[in-house]
Design a protein with these regions (language model features):
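GH16 jelly-roll
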Residues: 1-174
Length: 174
């Protein structure tokens, strides 16, 4: 288990972040590329968390999830906040997230796979991603845990390989 945390090192005001990565499959292996706010605890304190990509075990898809106070505590049913997206197993893929004034868009290999709308501007916890809030990148690989289950030693070693991380400022006039 290990990773790289960008907290207090480099933070980004949202636009688009792409990460070119590949990972091995193994029972109990959980690679994750995600974003947390530089200035607060996420996601139940009103801040957000953007899971750019997570992979579990031998799943033929990746998980892309958006967490907020709203999706975790207020409305867990009516506003879907996640997608299971296809990817090219065993190859480098580009996983991305774009934050716009009115939506968050997830991409795999530059193809949109999910969009989360800003539905209620009057509810701060529903869409805490847009504006001047800065997020930092976490690149992590975990062995074991409640979501992935126990590790099967015969499947190891397993690795997460990151080729690059690119960050783009928002170019639209929002």
């Amino acid at each position: 288990t290990g990773g790289l945390w960008g907290l207090d090192k480099k933070a980004f005001t949202m636009g688009r972040i792409d990460i070119r990565a590949k990972f091995d499959s193994a029972q109990g292996f959980w690679p994750a590329l995600w974003l947390l706010p530089q200035d607060g605890d996420a996601p139940n304190s009103g801040y957000g968390e953007l899971d750019i990509v997570e992979h579990l075990n031998f799943d033929p898809y990746v998980h892309m999830t958006l967490h907020s106070e709203y999706t975790n505590l207020v409305d867990k049913v009516n506003t879907p906040n996640a997608v299971q997206a296809p990817f090219n197993e065993g190859e480098f893929n580009i996983y991305g997230v774009e934050v716009h004034e009115d939506k968050v868009v997830y991409l795999v290999n530059n193809k949109e796979v999910y969009s989360y709308p800003r539905l209620y501007p009057e509810i701060p916890g529903q869409f805490p991603f847009y504006g001047q809030k800065q997020f930092y990148v976490i690149l992590s690989a975990q062995l074991g845990g409640q979501w992935v289950g126990s590790v099967t030693a015969a499947h190891l070693p397993a690795g997460l390989y990151v080729d690059w991380v690119k960050c783009y400022d928002a170019i639209e006039n929002e």
